[in-house]
Regions:
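A short glycine-rich, aromatic-capped structural motif
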Residues: 2-54, 67-71, 149, 195
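Compositionally biased, intrinsically disordered low-complexity regions enriched in proline and serine
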Residues: 6-9, 34, 46, 109, ...
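A residue-level signal for beta-strand positions that form part of recognition/binding surfaces
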Residues: 10-13, 27, 32, 131, ...
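Short, solvent-exposed loop/turn segments at secondary-structure junctions
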Residues: 21, 40, 95-97, 165, ...
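Functional-site microenvironments in short loops/helix caps that host divalent-cation chemistry
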Residues: 59-62, 68-187
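Short, structured beta-strand segments at or near domain termini in extracellular proteins/domains
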Residues: 187-198
Length: 198
């Protein structure tokens, strides 16, 4: 089984090996799954929706697609499943948190302190209120970029996870969640895609 493969249109999926997620005080088993290394980009989303309007900020092809509501994110997954012939979906909250923590037990995947956080997280203190290039921060131990900060990410349960470039660093974390209406769009909301192995 490969650790990564490239899929149309250019989404890189990393294998997240199964394990046990600690959610609150509970241990929850997690089956292996694939998760995109980065949130879906403008050029990837435009392949699904050519009429997609990019953020008003300067926006490159490989910048994250923002302003996407839950139904659009789910629609992208369904479309991607058809063109790739692979069952794609949004990650569950448990999968998302497990992938974010990357089997670490500290507050952040890089430790309990925010010292050095700027190497891993785009947040309100280091992002000049513009969508930052998410691939420019270091990945977590699972090889995933911008799991914390960057953009809020939709999950299958319509809950946003992780915080964004507008969130103060102290309010960002793998367990951070935000409940919004499914039609909520903002220039700090994006999404990743996932695929089960079975």
């Amino acid at each position: 089984m490969p650790d990564r493969y490239t899929h149309y249109p250019r989404a890189i999926l990393w294998l997240i090996r199964g394990g046990e997620a600690t959610i609150g005080d509970e241990k929850v088993p997690v089956e292996p799954f694939y998760l995109s290394k980065l949130p879906i980009s403008n050029i990837q989303f435009e392949a699904f929706d050519p009429a997609f309007k990019r953020s008003a900020h300067p926006s490159r092809d490989d910048d994250v697609a923002v302003g996407v509501d839950f139904e659009q994110a789910r629609g992208y997954c369904e479309w991607y499943a058809r063109v790739s012939r692979k069952p794609m979906r949004l990650p569950t909250e448990v999968e998302w948190e497990y992938a974010c923590r990357a089997e670490t037990t500290s507050k952040y995947f890089f430790g309990d302190s925010t010292d050095g956080a700027d190497r891993y997280v785009w947040h309100a203190g280091n992002s000049t209120d513009m969508i930052p290039p998410l691939h420019k921060v270091r990945p977590n131990p699972f090889g995933l970029h911008s799991m914390l900060g960057g953009v809020w990410e939709w999950t299958a349960s319509r809950v946003l996870r992780g915080g964004s470039y507008r969130t103060p660093l102290g309010d960002i974390g793998c367990g951070v969640r935000r409940v919004d209406e499914p039609d909520q769009r903002a220039d700090d909301i994006g999404f990743r895609i996932a695929r089960s192995l079975r």
